[in-house]
């Protein structure tokens, strides 16, 4: 399934007039071009209506207000709700029609930020719910008269809460051990730098990356014109292997013609995955996820036990990370990206005793608080790691 508004997936398979429902192009292969506008209207209509009212009151013309009420990249994230629908269908039917679902979703800067939206919304809504929401309701007439701007009603806040619940469910789906992200790049230095940043950000957000596909690689013997490109690509490909080790790196050669149609697309896939002798490109990735917790024993007489939260942050040094403790949450900031980690109940009671970054892994150490020394908790046994 593709979330690309330009319908590039439908074009690649030579489908004309493909609708928003899955279309079978080969036995066992279905293609879907997601109707992002439909999801946008369903999930964002109340909120966009309120934002239009605010902008209208501020004197913004109608057409400009219509554009400003759509968050850049939101359509792509909302399209992932269609993925959730497919998984629900799978569970309801006790197996369902799909063995695997592949989502063509470009990891742009906006999309990476919006993948953090569910947790950010939860942090915000936790602070406008309960007494704060009742206070807002009581003060709504006063605030409206004082500012001259519309104040969000219950239906707007409820719509945001529904969207947050939907996106949290999508997030839980995407961070399962069976789910993973596969990066696609071309062997160019600028593209490689962006792919490295994408790996760091995806790991920070808790998404597992299972490998890298290097696309449009000039094959040997392509001719004198391509010799310069081939030499330059060979240098970058060596950096790709070094940068992403131990992740597998597949290479796909530059095709003689644009691959359009099921046969041409299948040929590209066979070329890429044969480059490493991969038998099952859809195999569930092994090994720990990007975020996990490990129990630590007492370090000496009179010391309390502890735990270590580990977050994979490739290409990051200690000075690149900012940490802040906020109640039961740990706020991790790397460059322009921030993640609010809601700590397990056990760790939420324990103070942070230190943090370092070693070999691309952020290690945040907690020491048991005196009041919790005898309490039951959900920290794993000593030396054992468990996923976040």
Residue ranges, per PLM feature:
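A basic, amphipathic helix-loop patch mediating RNA/tRNA/ribosome contacts
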Residues: 317-321, 331, 354
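Flexible phosphate-sensing "switch/lid" loops adjacent to ATP/NTP-binding sites
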Residues: 2-175, 187, 241, 251
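Short hydrophobic/aromatic-rich beta-strand segments that constitute the beta-sheet cores
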Residues: 332-334, 364
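C-terminal beta-strand-rich structural cap/linker in extracellular carbohydrate-active enzymes
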Residues: 358-369
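Primarily hydrophobic membrane-targeting regions of prokaryotic envelope proteins
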Residues: 1-3, 83, 195, 200, ...
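C-terminal lobe/tail of nucleotide-utilizing enzymes
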Residues: 168-318, 327, 336-351, 367-388
């Amino acid at each position: 399934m593709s979330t690309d508004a330009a319908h590039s997936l439908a074009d690649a398979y030579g489908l004309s007039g493909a609708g928003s429902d899955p279309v079978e192009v080969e036995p066992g292969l279905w293609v879907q071009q997601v109707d992002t506008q439909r999801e946008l209207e369903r999930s964002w209509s109340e909120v966009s209506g309120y934002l239009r009212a605010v902008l209208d009151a501020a004197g913004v013309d109608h057409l400009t207000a219509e554009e400003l009420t759509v968050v850049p990249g939101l359509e792509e994230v909302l399209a992932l709700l269609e993925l959730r629908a497919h998984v629900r269908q799978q569970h309801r039917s006790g197996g369902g029609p799909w063995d695997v679902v592949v989502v063509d979703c470009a990891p742009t800067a906006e999309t990476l930020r919006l993948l953090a939206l569910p947790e950010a919304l939860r942090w915000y809504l936790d602070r406008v719910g309960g007494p704060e929401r009742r206070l807002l309701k009581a003060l709504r007439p006063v605030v409206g008269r004082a500012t001259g701007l519309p104040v969000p009603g219950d239906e707007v806040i409820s719509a945001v809460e529904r969207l947050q619940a939907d996106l949290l469910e999508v997030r839980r789906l995407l961070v399962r051990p069976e789910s993973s992200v596969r990066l696609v790049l071309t062997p160019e230095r600028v593209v490689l730098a962006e792919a490295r940043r994408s790996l760091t950000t995806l790991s920070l957000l808790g998404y597992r990356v299972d490998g890298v596909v290097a696309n449009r690689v000039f094959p040997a013997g392509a001719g004198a014109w391509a010799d310069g490109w081939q030499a330059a690509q060979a240098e970058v490909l060596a950096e790709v292997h070094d940068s992403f080790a131990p992740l597998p790196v597949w290479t796909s050669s530059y095709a003689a013609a644009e691959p359009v149609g099921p046969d041409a697309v299948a040929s590209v896939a066979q070329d890429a995955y044969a480059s490493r002798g991969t038998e099952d490109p859809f195999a569930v990735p092994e090994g720990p996820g990007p975020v996990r917790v490990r129990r630590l024993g007492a370090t000496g007489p009179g010391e309390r036990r502890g735990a270590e939260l580990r977050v994979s942050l490739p290409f990051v040094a200690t000075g690149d990370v900012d940490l802040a403790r906020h109640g039961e949450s740990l706020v991790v900031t790397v460059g322009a990206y921030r993640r609010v980690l809601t700590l397990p109940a056990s760790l939420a009671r324990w103070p942070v005793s230190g943090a370092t970054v070693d070999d691309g892994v952020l290690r945040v150490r907690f020491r048991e608080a005196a009041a919790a020394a005898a309490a039951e908790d959900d920290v794993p046994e000593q030396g054992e790691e468990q996923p976040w």
